[in-house]
Amino acid sequence: FPALNARPKELLDEWLAALTAQIDAARRADPGRKVGPFAVNQIVHHSNDRLDHDVALCVKHKVPMIITSLRAPGDVVKEVHGYGGIVFHDVINVRHAQKALEAGVDGLILVAAGAGGHAGTLSPFVLVSEVRRFWDGPIALSGAMTNGAQILAAQAMGADLAYMGTRFIPTPEAKAVHADK
């Protein structure tokens, strides 16, 4: 979830504490049950005046995965790696992918054309192919993912994961307004 969704910013600490407690309780109640990690999205652009605050809370709660966007996340990577977390970074082109990798990210989220409300304009075929020329680590493909056939196509192109967002807006868990659902 995006850290900036917590308003006021102090709410993020409550959310992370509650989420961590619920996950820990689920694991204790059924040790054999697979309980997936969660991720917090951080906008590392200079316009985000909450970044230091929000990253400090993610470090405090040892958020397993941080997803960054809008600038190479060097400082965030160091802090997250300090407690054993991982960082995936949103990229829309090859140059941004290279900069993110130089910053030490663990994986890339390739935001291709069709990613609702995002800046990706490249064909997923081109973007995955070009990035795979220099990166053999984890790639999640974002953009126009709505069903299993598209996920299979993403894997066939060389992506390890499919990143789906819009499809979840109508779910009961999403707090989107009814008109958007």
Protein language model regions, located:
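Active-site entrance/lid segments in N-terminal catalytic domains of soluble metabolic enzymes
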Residues: 1-138
